[in-house]
Every structure is written in C-alpha cells, then in structure tokens.
Amino acid sequence: MKEFELKYGCNPNQKPAKIYMADNSELPIKVLSGRPGYINFLDAFNGWQLVTNLKKATGLPAATSFKHVSPAGAAVGLPLTETLAKIYWVDDMDWKNFSPLACAYARARGADRMSSFGDFISLSDVCDKDTAMLIKREVSDGVIAPGYTEEALEILKQKKKGNYNVIQIDEDYVPAPLEHKEVFGVTFEQGRQELVIDDEMLSNIVTENKELTEEAKRDMKVSLIILKYTQSNSVCFVKDGQAIGVGAGQQSRVHCTRLAGQKADNWFLRQCPKVLNLPFKDTISRAERDNAIDVYIGDEYMDVLADGMWEKTFTEKPEVFTKDEKRAWLDQMTDVTLGSDAFFPFSDNIERAHKSGVKYIAQPGGSVRDDAVIETCNKYGMVMSFTGIRLFHH
C-alpha cells in the first residue's frame, strides 16, 4: 500500500486528505481494522517512536496513551501493586498475572485517566490477549503495534462494532534521516530526532547530592524519552517507570511544572484510602467514577457532594477530603523524578516540584539563573543532572 486515503484532515472541512510516502515506496503500516484518521496517524507514529525508544532504553515492554499528539501517559511493563490495580480499575481482572505489556498499558492509561479518555495506544511489542482485554474495556480510538496474536486481534476487531482502528507497523522500518513538513506552502527540512537517551546523558550531576539510584536513572530516561515526543514546552513527572503527570504545550515553563505537578498530585491522591473507599453506586461507569474523583479531590468538591448531587453517584454521602488531609497525604509522596525539555529559567519550578515529592531532576541546564536553581535543589537534597540537550518537539 503506497497511500491511504483519509476521510478528512485535522477537521472535517479539510479535504482531500491522505498519507503517503514521498519517495513512492510502500507505507510501513497495515490497517487491520477500522479507518484511522489524520490525527490518529499523528498519534500513532509519534507514540510508536516513544515506546520503541522506551523499550530500547529499559529493556522492558512499553505502552503509551496519546491524545492530540502528546502522551497523556506512558510506562514500561513493571508489575502492578494492589493499590495501582484499584485506581486503574483493573482489580476485577487477573491483574497479578498480567503480561508485562498489559502492565505497561494499565500504567500508561492510569496515569491521567481523564486525559486518556478516547486515546490512541502505541505498544512496543506484539499485542497479547491480556493487553487486548484491557483495551477492549476502555474508550479508545485505536492502537498501533508491531503485531497481534490471533486471539488479541479477534478481541480488538469486536470493539466499536468492528470499527475500532487497529494498525500494524513494520518494526524494521527506519525513516529517512531528513524529514519534511509544510506550513503555509513553505517546506521545512530538518534532521530526524535520533538522539539516544542513555546513562551517559545523566552523568553531569550538578547538585551536592549525587546519589543517583538505578531506579532513578531509569525514571530519568523514561521522563526524557516521553518529553522527546511531547508538544513543547513540556515537563514530565515519573515514578516507578511510568509517567504520573505530563504538562504539555504550555508557553510558560512554570505552568508546565504546575500542570504536570497537579496531575501527579491527583495520581497520588487517588491512592488515599479516603478516595479508594468512595461508596460508588454499582451502576456508575469507570469514566463516570474518574470524573467524580477528579472533582472530589479538587477545589470544587461540592459539585459532587452537595445535597441533590451526591445521590446520583454515591450510595452514601462521602466526607469532605479537606485541604489539610490532602496535604498530609501528599507529603508522603517521595522519590519522584522530574524531566524538562528545556532549562528552568527560575527556581520557582523547583519549589513547585518539591511539593509533589520530586527528588530527581533531569534538565538541559544553560539558564543564566542555573546557580539559583541548583541552590534550591540543594536546599531540598535533590539530585539534578544537566543533560546539555534540549528536547523541543513541534
């Protein structure tokens, strides 16, 4: 297949639309089900690069959950804990025996379930039955993987009444070293982003604390690889091999940090027993529970707790999750890693990161205020590496 006709481009009025190879060669993909759209393919090709990079860097299967050409979550295939199984809504499945790939997708989808609603999934490995069963129960636009077991493909083909988008990509495909993009009739050309993120990139530790654990190195690499394929400006919080908060596409660095930090806080607040034990009605769907939890742990909690409102969601009225209770729980969050796609211009980013349990930071460095940023890291005993490499993505 040398080209694939699309229903339309970014929007329904943008016609005609297609994907094709400029050199008239075969496309590196097969569409096994559905009819993917323009944005689906943007998500798929960016996500595929992300998960293959993650697998190469860690040796573990990887998955990502993309929305609007940025990852809402991404993870490598580490086993789930009982608490994570509960907050990712997989505790009713045989989660203790999940394949590593299924664990990776459960983590990627679970990082920010509000943003992942209607995601496009990328998988580093052949999609197995466990992973397909996870995908089947979520609201999702499609998936790309290097292959599918017969059982997994049959499960996915039943989704959306047979219209779920399933793409198989040639895992041996290597793009040309130069890439092109056209904007307003003008063609842009640049070398493809082929930077390899490895331990050597993390070796320039500029803080007093230089104790970088193997787990922290892994999480630093995970954060930087995620940022490599996230719309800039971007900041990513990572813990235990998975994104727990991605702040994408903000013009201000500190707003990236605040956004990612708030998402990381929400991820951790979901694990508090007060949230885990919310008395949901049996008829409330997972998506509705996600929405209710998001409001409950936020500042507008009375939107779900007011009389006449709580009865729609809960069997009994939950207690308010007070600001002091939330702060006390968040103070238990530790050993979080933070990556940034460009330098921190002010130390306010570090102050905000500290509130979300950040101990390890990877950023390019190069700000005129690097000394102030380092000083703030030292105040909190953080470990910070200057990579010397910017990771803008547009």
For the regions a protein language model found, what residue spans apply to each?
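Gly-rich Lys/Arg/Thr-decorated short loops/hinges at beta-loop-alpha junctions or inter-strand turns
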Residues: 23-35, 111-117, 193-210, 287-309, ...
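Flexible, glycine/charged-enriched surface loops at secondary-structure junctions
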Residues: 57-65, 166-169, 232-239, 269-280, ...
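Substrate-contacting helices/loops that form the catalytic groove of nucleic-acid
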Residues: 177-212, 270-282, 286-291
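Conserved helix-loop functional segments at active or binding sites
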Residues: 53, 229, 266-270, 355, ...
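Active-site-proximal loop/turn and secondary-structure-junction residues that shape catalytic pockets
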Residues: 70, 127, 239-242, 344, ...
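Active-site loops and adjacent core secondary-structure elements that bind or stabilize anionic groups
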Residues: 1-201, 216-234
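C-terminal binding/interaction regions
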Residues: 119, 123-124, 137-167, 172-174, ...
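Glycine- and Gly-Pro-enriched alpha-helical subdomains that act as flexible
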Residues: 72-113, 244-343
